[in-house]
Amino acid sequence: MPGPRPRKGPKTSGQGAETAKQLGLFVEFNPEDMLLGMDETEDDGDLEAELLALTGETGSTSRKPAPKGRAPLPMAHIEKLAADCMRDVEEEGEEEEGLEDDADLLTELQEVLGVDEETGLVDDSEETSPDLSEEKTRDNTEQPVAPAAFQQALPAAVAQAGGPRGLQALLEERIQNYREAAASAKEAGEAAKARRCERGLKTLESQLATVRKGGKICEDEIPPPVALGKRPPAHQERPSKDSEIDSAGSCAMDPGDLSQPESSLPAVAALPDSDPDPQALLLARQREYKAAALSAKRAGDLDRARELMRIGKRFGTVLEALEKGQPVDLSGMPPAPEDLKALPQASEASAATQVLSPAVEQMQPVMSSDLPATPAAPAEPKTVLDALQQRLNRYREAGIQARASGDERKARMHDRIAKQYQDAIRAHQAGRKVDFAELPVPPGFPPIPGLEPRKDTEEDSVTATLAAAQKLASEDTALVDEDEERDTPAQAPLAKKPAQPLVPSSHLLNEPKASSSKESLSPSVREQVTLLEARKLQYQRAALQAKRRQDLEQAKSHLRVAKSLEAQIIQARAGQPIDLSKVPSPLTDEEGDFILIHHEDLRLSQKAEEVYAQLQKILLEQHEKCLLFSKQFMHQGNVAETTRFEKLAEDRKKQLEILQLAQAQGLDPPSHHFELKTLQTVRIFSELNSTEMHLIIVRGMNLPAPPGVTPDDLDAFVRFEFHYPNSDQAQKSKTAVVKNTNSPEFEQVFKLNINRNHRGFRRVIQSKGIKFEIFHKGSFFRSDKLVGTAHLKLERLEKECEIREIMEVLDGRKPTGGKLEVKVRLREPLSSQDVQMVTENWLVLEPRGL
């Protein structure tokens, strides 16, 4: 059996604290112990002796012996640690030892500090020249001085530039520097340096945009210039350029001119590289040429004026390139116009054309690919994908150029167009249909293969339309143009000349294509094209007449219609189907088209005036009928009948003009007769949609009155019900109440929704029809009373587009004697065309009666 538990002895004091320390509890952390790795420093004898010496007390002889602890680190060990720490810095300095021999960094430092590459001399204005000479002899440990020099040189350069304008010039120069550095790095295959230059270029472009908008930037954040490497000095290229200009001038001179040194052209002055503002020089030279052209015109020398003005206009192209930030070589700029006065008048035009034209062309070598009017157009694409890719690349380049010049709005516009081309390329590659007509076309680009070339801009087309309309006029417009030139300043007509030759040139280029394509068209398509061209000509004539009446709004409206007809003509010639229902209707006569001259001494008899009025009324009615029939056939797509009725309408119009002219001159009414003419027409209600049917409740006749109500007190209204799409969702409505009559006139139109191809609609048409109920409106305490019912059958809508029916009003099955007239209209019959033969008494005026 277990024995009794042994009794525990009493615990000694302090044993619990030792246990807690062993468990990690209540441990006193000493920062010096943690730093020096010492367990106890309280019982250090040296420290206690020093403390007693400071306090002036005598040491206690009865203190405990110091426990043996860890001694502090020796100084040799500490020095070794310090040497190890310093060793990294020295090794890093040794790694940077080769930076002094880096040619790119040295060139970059020399450019910032203004040091010449070959001589090593510094500009007088720089204060860092002694530092540079000392830096070349210093040790490798002094190498980090270079970044400080960069930071000091940058504000100095900005301060010398002078304000925001100088800051903008500095940024533009720095952008050009980074572009050249990126290009040279790409050519050398240094991808890292190229990416670094591109990042700096983006920063500079954003800073330039901020400065142009009037914002402020931190000058310390401007990236420093980068080294471009060794390039051939500029003074070596100068003699070659001068020799080329001299050789060009010597080649352009004729041998016959050697005997006449006073008539030779002066040498073309090259613009020095240090010219501060080339734009001001170009503007001044352009103004000189314009002033010289104006003075030559006033002096009567028109040939010289034209030549000077032609040269002056070429400066505009160079100025546009300069504004876009493109590099322009001004070494071939034409001389001042005063230097050309020595030329004889006979040989001035030819000599100026031979010498000055190449000189002006030398100023714009960079712009040959950017201008829309230049002959250097993109290569002709072989496939649709090539054409789309060419245009995508062009708009991307335009967006980059706009963003570089700070025009963010234009850059975003080009990016959106580029996105459209990207979507079009993806859709074309996926085999989906792409509407290429909606894609913008860059100027000067060839058309997409397989498509018709696009026309000019809207302004050019309006100008072309006006020019074509003025050709139709019988007046001589040349004299009017000469008078306008005399009244207006001399510069105004000269500025408009470039737009005028573009119109006939485009037409001359398109005429052979149009004629050849027209010959290959089918007869039906040829009829459509003839109709559209005649309609376009009619609107152009109307626009010209409106312009003569000073009605510019009407003229613009007619020109827009003529422009829309141009697009339809192009589609018809390309073989695409044309919806003739969307072709604008022929113009109708207006009262202001005719001027009636009343003579006081010429009086017509009352009978003659009545005859004239009757004849004019008949002609107007026949003219309107012809236009109506023409419109109906146009909606059917029958071009032949449309043209026929338009010619009849034109004949009625001419007869009406003859009649009004005879009445204005006071003549007797012309001899006339009537002929029976049978016209085959197709009935159609073009104002209706194919998804709607109109129900017209016209009138009630002799409706019965309910018991207790007299016929004169009948307040009638009609309620109808059309069971489509089904009986539960039948279309219902009612007319307004017509009071106190048994023959009410309703004349109300109700629009019913239908689906012509739906089987249920055909079933309702053939079997059910429309049910009508006639009610008498009750008073305040009385309900409505049923008068009678009627039913309309709709089978005739299969072959007719309108049903007009006078139905018997029934009381149950018993007739009441009342009638109800209704009409039902569709756009066109359900199964076939509604062909009608119309016989008209056709009025014919005899010419001998005039």
From Swiss-Prot:
Molecular function per GO: DNA-binding transcription factor activity, RNA polymerase II-specific; DNA-binding transcription repressor activity, RNA polymerase II-specific; RNA polymerase II cis-regulatory region sequence-specific DNA binding
Ranges of Pro residues composition bias in the record: 440-450
Biased composition (Low complexity): 489-502, 511-524
Protein name as catalogued: Coiled-coil and C2 domain-containing protein 1B
GO biological process: negative regulation of transcription by RNA polymerase II; regulation of transcription by RNA polymerase II
Function, in words: Transcription factor that binds specifically to the DRE (dual repressor element) and represses HTR1A gene transcription in neuronal cells.
Gene3D superfamilies listed in its UniProt record: C2 domain
Bias kind Basic and acidic residues: ranges: 234-244
Originating organism: Rattus norvegicus
